[in-house]
């Protein structure tokens, strides 16, 4: 990660706001902080927050870059605000947005998994149970069914994630049940509003490929559980839900077939 970007973020924030860089993607750099943007700086808090920063891209004209950064940051903020109001859908809470400078301040989700398995995204969560030689236990089954339900609720409300990998699903330990992990969808930088079954089919296919690439030995069962949860959301919505589900699964099969052909051809 570029030290220049880290220094820019620290200069933008107050010197009394500590930030720790945790990841860098193609579009943004992600930091954690213990300071809430609207509380006094000397207010002690045990909470953690996410700061997502879209840094300037030198290959773009500065005026175009500024416009794109503002548009994309504001778009993600608006999308998160809408998703947060959907009953039963788990996404991070938006705390603050500075679209002009490319900053989002978000609720921090997840935790460090035991035995050095890293941050509690779905990928690491499944690896942890695989290492325990218990990849098909009820905890994993329930988690994957609920992952499917989250995607189903997202799609039923005509939204798509756009980058639905197992790293962008965070498992949050339930406060009331030590064996229950609640999936939350994060990183909606490529998310959108859409009614197109193609977009939704691609969303599911991207997650399927992610699970196949990192958990190939158990992927068939994992994907089956995930799809069971996904289908259940649509099936609860009567004839219309069944009709939409049939259309979506048909398109998903077509997307999957195209992906396999592409893999064979190279």
From Swiss-Prot:
Superkingdom classification of source: Eukaryota
Keywords: Activator, ATP-binding, Chromosome, Cytoplasm, Hydrolase, Kinase, Nucleotide-binding, Nucleus, Phosphoprotein, Serine/threonine-protein kinase, Telomere, Transcription, Transcription regulation, Transferase, tRNA processing
Places the protein is found: Cytoplasm; Nucleus; Chromosome, Telomere
Classification via InterPro entries: Bud32 (IPR022495), Kinase-like_dom_sf (IPR011009), Prot_kinase_dom (IPR000719), Tyr_kinase_AS (IPR008266)
Chief location of this protein within or outside the cell: cytoplasm
Gene Ontology biological-process annotations: positive regulation of transcription by RNA polymerase II; telomere maintenance via recombination; tRNA processing; tRNA threonylcarbamoyladenosine metabolic process
Domain Protein kinase: from-to ranges: 16-266
Similarity comment: Belongs to the protein kinase superfamily. BUD32 family.
Protein's UniProt name: EKC/KEOPS complex subunit BUD32
Annotated source species: Candida glabrata (strain ATCC 2001 / BCRC 20586 / JCM 3761 / NBRC 0622 / NRRL Y-65 / CBS 138) (Yeast)
